[in-house]
Regions:
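Intrinsically disordered, low-complexity terminal tails/loops enriched in metal-binding residues
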Residues: 1-137
Length: 137
């Protein structure tokens, strides 16, 4: 992956941080707005292999709406997160971003480990710190 592509992927992961935070606090309007920002960041990635891997995610990000119930948005975010986890595991994008999962809700996400050492589960408000760090990059 070129340095330019790496920078654009990191920009997308940074946009995902904002989306992760809005899911963690669950602010429906912020969830929709940050989903759009992540989609725009993905659109800015020019590496063909990476964009192919994230193409499905763009559609799922478009389906994340403030008017949806939380579970619908959680399902779409989980699908987006699975693609981002694949990117983080396949390419060297630095050590900040790692894959996390919660066995209770059976969902995964990418989290900035350097900013948040503790698990921040974006799916389960009743279990905000349930889950585990699955990778160490």
């Amino acid at each position: 992956m070129s340095e330019a592509a790496k920078k654009s992927v990191i920009s997308a992961l940074e946009a995902n941080e904002a989306l992760h935070n809005s899911f963690f606090k669950y602010d429906a309007k912020a969830v929709e707005a940050n989903a759009k920002k992540l989609k725009n960041a993905i659109n800015a990635i020019e590496d063909k292999d990476v964009t192919k891997l994230l193409n499905f995610s763009k559609g799922k990000l478009s389906e994340i709406k403030a008017s949806n119930d939380r579970e619908t948005n959680n399902k779409n975010y989980h699908l987006v997160s699975m693609a981002l986890i694949h990117i983080v595991n396949k390419y060297d994008v630095g050590s900040k971003y790692n894959a996390y999962s919660c066995p209770m809700v059976k969902k995964k996400w990418v989290q900035n480990s350097s900013k948040m050492a503790k698990v921040h589960n974006p799916y389960a408000p009743n279990m905000p710190h349930c889950g585990s760090k699955d990778t160490t990059h």
